[in-house]
């Protein structure tokens, strides 16, 4: 929350064009401190374009941003980062053969000494890395081990802890669970809750409602560059979110159209079965989700 009780980050009427292609059209959303806003949509919905405008990679052609209640114009990623908007992309910007602590401070290396005798402060870097990861509930065996030896979920957690350490007020996570298995996705979701509990506004980009719903407080659904739905958690259950995301309504409508055209041919029946399978899958997957309660702190 801002000092006046409003959203930490607010986007109003953002549009972005690439020639004649409309990537975003009149998109509005907000992010509150200590909440997870889930930005959902299929491939090509406009999620990546929106986060690149939020993080300063692209400049919007229309609309405005308010950060902490003040109008902002992000001309570069550094502008956004200096205001406290940090983005963790899928590739994580890590070097696998470097140690965890070197990756943690990559680009912001701490030094000691002066003049020609200035050198990397290894002791501070290793101690800080271990301490910051511990605050997030991340237990690493050795800060000197190459970051490439960590699992995908552990590397994501290191990137999240790094952003938090360097003062992120808004943390944008670009599909952090997309390439992970069930167990490692659960690890990342737990650390997202940890960041939220530390008062950070989190934007969680995903195309998987089963990953978003357990941690989300607010859900914004994009479709073809426009906001298709905007709901608080208490307004929409997981089944409704899946229905909006997966096109269950479209499948059923198409089945009716085919039924009228082909007098109930096999294509219509197949589509109806697909819609029923989608509903059944909602229940079975929900049973495998990580716990929705607060994540354990550093002490377990």
Report each predicted region and the residues it spans:
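Long, low-complexity, intrinsically disordered segments
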Residues: 285-300
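Glycine-rich phosphate-binding loops of nucleotide-dependent enzymes
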Residues: 2-281
């Amino acid at each position: 929350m801002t000092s006046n009780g409003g959203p930490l980050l607010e986007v109003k009427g953002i549009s972005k064009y690439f020639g004649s292609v409309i990537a975003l059209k009149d998109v509005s959303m907000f992010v509150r401190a200590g909440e997870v806003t889930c930005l959902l949509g299929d491939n090509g919905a406009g999620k990546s374009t929106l986060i690149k405008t939020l993080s300063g990679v692209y400049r919007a052609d229309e609309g405005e941003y308010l950060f902490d209640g003040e109008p902002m114009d992000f001309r570069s990623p550094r502008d956004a980062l200096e205001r406290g908007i940090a983005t963790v992309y899928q590739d994580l910007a890590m070097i696998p053969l470097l140690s965890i602590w070197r990756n943690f401070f990559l680009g912001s290396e701490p030094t000691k000494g002066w003049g020609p005798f200035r050198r990397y402060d290894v002791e501070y870097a290793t101690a800080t890395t271990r301490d910051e990861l511990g605050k997030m509930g991340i237990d690493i065996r050795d800060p000197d081990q190459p970051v490439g030896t960590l699992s995908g979920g552990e590397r994501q957690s290191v990137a999240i802890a790094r952003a938090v350490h360097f003062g992120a007020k808004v943390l944008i996570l670009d599909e952090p669970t997309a390439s992970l298995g069930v167990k490692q996705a659960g690890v990342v979701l737990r650390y997202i809750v940890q960041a939220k509990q530390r008062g950070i506004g989190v934007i969680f980009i995903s195309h998987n409602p089963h990953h978003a719903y357990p941690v989300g407080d607010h859900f914004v659904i994009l479709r073809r560059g426009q906001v298709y739905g905007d709901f608080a958690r208490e307004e929409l259950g997981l089944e409704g979110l899946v229905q909006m995301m997966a096109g269950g309504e479209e499948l059923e409508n198409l089945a009716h159209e085919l039924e009228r055209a082909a007098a109930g041919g096999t294509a219509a029946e197949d589509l109806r079965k697909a819609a029923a399978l989608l509903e059944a899958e909602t229940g079975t997957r929900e049973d495998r989700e990580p716990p929705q309660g607060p994540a354990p702190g550093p002490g377990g």
